[in-house]
């Protein structure tokens, strides 16, 4: 088994209809694949958006709301409905699912970070599938672009996953926008994320979600620097999860850093909040940049 512990991330557009409402058929396609991988012995985590999509209709909104308060209210209703769909589908295959709602503060505070990691480890050991989302109802920052892409990368690094798979309706990473540029070429393998790669990513490509290819590239950076390989591939294919798990997906693969950052450096680099200032002389600057320490 090449990748035992896998984090899958599905965005809102991957589990909704064209009108923005939840698609039970798309969710069933995802859970069917998760169940098959679970039976094969994989340890699985699902980071799923979709709470707003699941809830706005129940509150009487005709379309996906725009105002923050309306989104948060929709998420409060929709998170339970979203979990109900996942739980019903997975339990029919004898799989226990667990809901975990996280926010930026859970990563910034080291004790909460360690507690979350401990809970996830127990769930995986007990063969449950944790289903994770941002805490949309109380977190304003979460509703901005990049939420669950970044969250999935942070979770993958936290639990030392063997693979992160970002499922999207935007088909892989190209050198340009394939919808407007017929000469755009798909990038199958990315060994280093540089400024050119970031430029290629562009902006959001979906009307129903909050993230685009650029947020996925940023998420891939976090995971790859932490030693976790990353796939970006289409959620529209019936066996996309299984293909990614076997390293056969028709998508863009990001090669991880050979020696991933240790847990302490991960936390400092990606999760902790910067406060105050530190001034160093030229000698210390050279030692820190070249050797990673000044003593």
Curated annotation (Swiss-Prot):
Keywords: Amino-acid biosynthesis, ATP-binding, Cytoplasm, Kinase, Nucleotide-binding, Proline biosynthesis, Transferase. GO terms for molecular function: ATP binding; glutamate 5-kinase activity. The keyword Membrane does not apply. Substrate binds at residues 49, 136, 148. Transmembrane segments: none annotated. GO terms for biological process: L-proline biosynthetic process. The keyword ATP-binding applies. One of its GO terms (cellular component) is cytosol. It catalyses: L-glutamate + ATP = L-glutamyl 5-phosphate + ADP. ATP binds at residues 9, 168-169, 210-216. SUPFAM superfamilies: Carbamate kinase-like. Belongs to the glutamate 5-kinase family. PANTHER family: GLUTAMATE 5-KINASE, ISOPENTENYL PHOSPHATE KINASE. Catalyzes the transfer of a phosphate group to glutamate to form L-glutamate 5-phosphate. This is Glutamate 5-kinase. It comes from Neisseria gonorrhoeae (strain NCCP11945).
